[in-house]
From Swiss-Prot:
UniProt organism field: Bitis rhinoceros
Keywords: Disulfide bond, Glycoprotein, Hemostasis impairing toxin, Hydrolase, Protease, Secreted, Serine protease, Signal, Toxin, Zymogen
Residues at the catalytic site: 64, 109, 203
Record-given protein name: Snake venom serine protease rhinocerase 4
Protein family per UniProt: Belongs to the peptidase S1 family. Snake venom subfamily.
Signal peptide (UniProt feature, chain positions): 1-17
Residue ranges occupied by any Peptidase S1 domain in the UniProt entry: 24-248
Primary subcellular site in the record, as a coarse category: secreted
Any GO CC annotation of this UniProt entry: extracellular region
Xref: Gene3D superfamilies: Trypsin-like serine proteases
Keyword Signal: yes
Length: 257
């Protein structure tokens, strides 16, 4: 049943390109053991995102990935050949920076999901650590997801793709997109003049630097990585206190202003 449902969703999601967000352009199939924290987030309407397992009960994703009837798969690689240890969960609770789920392109695009039951760690399931410090400009980081590998005329793979990109100075994204504030709680990442980056279906997935989740895929250009345009990622380091407070039981904790 899972195979049929997910295969249909990968077709359906293309008609929802404006509702979901940003697959990996310019990457290659991930090694089956390098994305143990990567979650597939979807619903029966065809909306598709990714998430990041940070412990047995909690998944991080992007606020704009919130959807009704959310399903979360962990330990998945090829949707046509399920792994024996893959698990399906649904949200028990969802937490956002603001009660009305308000977020912008440069602030608070983050969602913390408590699973309905703990996920056992296994060969294909393991958590990713929260950052101990913010990444520095020039850092080489890893992106991954089931997002489109071409844009426009998106095609969606049955396996997650991975690629390496660099942390860029925020001014690069300001120059590319304009109208961004002088400061924001986002990271700018990509490879100038090369078409490598996140795309449709990758939203909510990780930007991994030095083995830690430094960013959450938020948004990028349309078409994806047009003329080598960088992508924008929620800066997880700025939200670590909020994340730890929520997980620790302080469900009224507020995000940084």
């Amino acid at each position: 049943v899972l195979i049929r449902v997910l295969a249909n969703l990968l077709v359906l999601q293309l008609s929802y390109a404006q509702k979901s967000s940003e697959l990996v352009i310019g990457g290659a199939e991930c090694n089956i053991n390098e994305h143990r924290s990567l979650a597939l987030v979807y619903n029966s309407s065809g909306l598709l995102c990714c998430g990041i397992l940070i412990n047995q009960e909690w998944v991080l994703s992007a606020a704009h990935c919130d959807m009704e009837n959310m399903q979360i798969y962990l330990g998945l690689h090829n949707i046509s050949r399920p792994n024996q240890d893959q698990k399906r969960r649904v949200p028990k609770q969802k937490f956002f920076c603001l009660s009305n789920k308000t977020y912008t392109r440069w602030d608070k695009d983050i969602m913390l999901i408590k699973l309905n039951s703990p996920v056992p760690y296994s060969t294909h399931i393991a958590p990713l650590s929260l950052p101990s410090s913010p990444p520095i400009v020039g850092s080489v980081c890893r992106i991954m997801g089931w997002g489109a590998t071409k844009s426009p005329n998106e095609n969606v793979p049955h396996v997650p793709h991975c690629a390496n990109i660099n942390i860029l100075h925020y001014s690069v994204c300001r120059a590319t997109y304009g109208r961004l504030p002088a400061k924001s709680r986002t990271l700018c990442a990509g490879i100038p003049r090369r078409r490598i980056g996140s795309c449709l279906g990758d939203s909510g997935g990780p930007l991994i630097c030095n083995g830690q989740v430094e960013g959450i895929v938020s948004w990028a250009s349309k078409p994806c990585v047009h003329n080598g345009a960088p992508g924008m990622y929620t800066k997880v380091y700025d939200y670590t206190d909020w994340i730890r407070s929520i997980i620790g039981g302080n469900t009224s904790a507020t995000c940084p202003l």
